[in-house]
A protein has these predicted regions:
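Long, intrinsically disordered low-complexity tandem-repeat segments
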Residues: 508-509, 525-567
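C-terminal, flexible cofactor-proximal segment of oxidoreductases
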Residues: 210-213, 223-224, 231-232, 372, ...
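C-terminal catalytic lobe of FAD-dependent flavoproteins
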Residues: 250, 254-258, 262-327, 332-353, ...
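FAD-binding beta-loop-beta segment adjacent to the flavin cofactor pocket
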Residues: 51-60, 152-153, 299-301, 356-383, ...
Length: 571
């Protein structure tokens, strides 16, 4: 080593992101006995999308007792659908309870990561310094980078402009003429929250969403006491919420015509609040319910009926000074513009900063559409996996269930590397990646997302659905329980003979093959009741004691996107 050079820090695993995916990965690593890891977070605190999205009314549209880790149940959720403050507090408690703080590197945005084929490790450049890692777990999530549309004249607009995921709390909306661009999951929360205080609110709607009422309420003190003292009541509540959603899946994936009854209920819900037939016609979708995410709100339609709220059933075409011009030619003078136009879901910006074994970026490898083996590993990117990867999203349930399934896969992947021993990498075979994705896309053909007659953020530039999982969470759990080494090439440092892949013997289901001496999966990984967010709850995985009370603040109003996070909708 030359004078002036320094030895870069090396870790076994580098986790990117500290939302549900990143913190969940960190907990699972500790449970697997792995402490040589870091969590690289670009912001100055943990929380992911629940840190970034703090707009008025921000909340989750999956019930709180299902939208939480099975290994960290919280008996003190304040509401059926808890607000952003409570969810963010829950994630902070997870970081504290499981002793994760010492692993987390705040203000360490990843600038570039490159695979070193000679040393079989990842070289990572961050805003806080460089390091290397044997394995990278990318948990940046699909709802991390806001998408701003290119609108002619936007740069010259003299008023205030911001995205819902970058809410400017210093800007006072009171008495202002405000434009809301988009009618997705963020917008239906923001509109009811700000309508009473603004002078005039103009909502630009390109495509109307289907909206169902939200059955939200405060969780009583008696219920919370029962969940603390009798954990089976909490488990039963979670199990019921999960089971109902599993039973709904077939209507979305196999028999979309069954959704007609739900459409009738949605129309009746609209009619109760919107008496004007002209406005009601503008708000009625022309596509099958479920094709886009079904939104939940009991406040959105009443807000649209307010005298100071206008609906423009057209997209925003251009801006001339302070005048917004819609595609239908209508003009509206505005003081502030709020964009609720979603995120870079199928074109994640971090993909430009991941360079694989062949010198190509992940963005280049995915230029014709994202695809990953079991939603986790990509061909050409050894020892790299993603949490909430391609085709792992859900249309009606909790993304936390999918995250925990992927953590099972991550844990077995690391066990296999440990059993192989030495400096080694697992590289997803292109044939296995293609076979998996053909299987997923074949199942996608009958789903409402592909046949419902809409264009949604689930689809990529080629019109392929690379976002949603076309099955139940139980099916995905089974598909990701084990790593099938037949789907991987085992790579050694050059000059050493590679170890042959282990193929499942006759009679053993794919994915069940084990190398001699491989450890069984940690049975604690997906069982509820491990750590409890309540007074006196015991922690595990080497964490410190659990903070009393848990995430009990902030009920919040409105409903946000489900398991996937917040603000999924487009204009």
């Amino acid at each position: 080593m030359g004078e002036g050079e320094r030895v870069r820090e090396h870790v076994r695993v580098a986790v990117i992101g500290s939302g549900f995916g990143g913190l969940g990965a960190a907990v699972r690593l500790r449970r697997e006995g792995i402490t040589d890891f870091v969590v690289l977070e670009r912001a100055d605190s943990v929380g992911g999308t629940w840190r970034d999205n703090s707009y008025p009314g921000c909340a989750c549209d999956v019930p709180s007792h299902l939208y939480s880790f099975s290994f960290a149940p919280n008996p003190d959720w304040p509401r059926t659908f808890s607000g952003q403050p409570a969810i963010r507090e829950y994630l902070e408690h997870v970081a504290d309870t499981f002793g994760l703080r010492r692993h987390i590197r705040l203000n360490h945005e990843v600038r570039m990561m490159r695979w070193d084929a000679d040393e079989l490790r990842w070289e990572i450049e961050t805003a806080g310094g460089d390091l290397t890692a044997d394995v990278v777990v990318s948990a940046t999530g699909p709802l991390s980078d806001p998408k701003m549309p290119e609108i002619p004249g936007l740069a010259e607009f003299p008023g205030k402009v911001f995205h819902s995921a970058r809410w400017d709390h210093d800007y006072d909306l009171a008495g202002k003429r405000v434009a809301m661009i988009g009618t997705g999951a963020s917008a239906i929360q923001i509109v009811p929250a700000i309508a009473p205080e603004v002078r005039r609110l103009t909502l630009f709607q390109r495509t109307p969403p289907w909206v169902m009422p939200r059955t939200d309420r405060a969780i009583t003190a008696v219920e919370r006491w029962l969940h603390r003292q009798l954990p089976f009541t909490r488990a039963a509540r979670r199990g019921l919420l999960w089971g109902i959603r599993e039973l709904q899946v077939s209507a979305f994936t196999k028999r979309p015509n069954q959704l007609g009854l739900i459409e009738s209920l949605a129309k009746a819900n609209m009619a109760r609040s919107i008496k004007d037939p002209v406005l009601r016609a503008k708000l009625t979708p022309s596509y099958r319910i479920g094709c886009k995410r079904i939104l939940l709100s009991s406040e959105y339609y009443p807000a649209l009926a307010r005298p100071n709220v206008d609906l423009v059933a057209s997209g925003l075409k251009e801006i001339r000074g302070s005048v917004l011009v819609a595609a239908d030619g209508s003009e509206t003078e505005i003081d502030a513009i709020i964009f609720g136009t979603g995120f870079h879901v199928t074109d994640m910006p971090i993909a430009d900063r991941v360079v694989g074994a062949e010198g190509k970026t992940l963005a280049d490898a995915w230029k014709d559409g994202m695809q990953a083996l079991r939603g986790a590993t990509a061909a050409g990117f050894p020892n790299w996996m993603t949490i909430i990867g391609p085709n792992t999203g859900l249309g009606n349930s909790s993304m936390i269930l999918m995250i925990e399934s992927q953590l099972n896969y991550m844990a077995d992947y690391l066990r296999q590397l440990g059993v192989l021993g030495g400096r080694v990498a697992l590289a997803a075979r292109p044939s296995a990646v293609n076979r998996w994705n053909r299987h997923v896309q074949a199942r996608m053909e009958r789903t409402v997302w592909n046949t419902g007659g809409c264009t949604s953020w689930y689809l990529d530039a080629q019109g392929r659905n690379t976002t949603v999982w076309p099955g139940t969470t139980g099916e995905f759990r089974r598909e990701t329980q084990r790593v099938d080494l037949a789907e991987y090439e085992v790579v050694r440092v050059r000059g050493r003979e590679p170890v042959a892949a282990v193929v499942a013997p006759a009679g053993v289901a794919p994915g069940a093959a084990r190398l001699p001496g491989a450890l069984p999966p940690d049975p604690r990984a997906s069982n509820a009741g491990e750590a409890e967010f309540a007074s006196g709850g015991a922690s595990n995985a080497g964490g410190a004691g659990v903070a009393p009370g848990g995430a009990s603040k902030g009920g919040g109003t409105g409903v946000a996107p489900s398991g996937a996070g917040v603000g999924e909708g487009g204009a």
